[in-house]
Amino acid sequence: VYKRQFLDSLLERASKEPKTIVLPEGEDERILQAAHAVAARKAAKLIILGNPEEIKAYFAQNNWDMEDIELIQPETSEKLESYANLLYELRKAKGMTPNDARKLALNYNYFGTLMIKSGDADGMVSGANHSTADTVRPALQIIKSAHKERSVSSALILVANDKPYIFSDCAIIINPSEQELADMALASSETALKFGIEPKVAMLSYSTRGSGSGGMVDKVRNATKLAQEMLQSEEYKNLPIMIDGEMQADAALDSVVARKKAPDSQVAGQANVLIFP
């Protein structure tokens, strides 16, 4: 029940200021079903990339209308050349040729990302049929990071036991440094706030408050200090973010364990943002 309520609340918020979102995986029925659900709630204006005739046939087969949905086939798009030229200008210093740029612009993830860069869309949802690398690479090359001085990481939202949790980083950085872990903690906190979640961040480890030792423990402990220092900056000091660590997963999530292992922690036992080392 909570999962449905959580999704409904997100759709309701989105419908108040609908954005234009590109869906580059129009060949996947799950994407088309999701597009119908979002469009029916008027939560976004959607652009689906794929074969228009096949997509129209699928919608007709299900008796769905296509209001607020635009279909584009990159191979025949009138914008293809301008997008290819844009990509060439952005990447020529890296050795990209005009021919390389045109080939890449035909890749649906690149095409969708170039739409955003050109101002023809606000965002893109991808990854159902593409690897993380193939999904993220165009964004890193074309859009780039919002914070140039910080590392790029990923976060996922999981709803369990009527509560939302955010996990980071489960897809991009394999062995994060202390600074990268601190960056993850702050970036995930920002994500939580955007979803209406007041972040209580646990920096996970196999140790809780010095119960274990080793290089990994030191890394997480130092990352926690870095993140807490970053919280004092002008950007974050007035935001309701709490970060604590190092702590084991049971201490982060279980209130009984938390009272034994970290009784003075404001995060232990009630963490909703988990940073994996």
Where are these regions (language model features)?
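Anion-binding alpha/beta catalytic cores of soluble intermediary-metabolism enzymes, centered on
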Residues: 3-268, 272-277
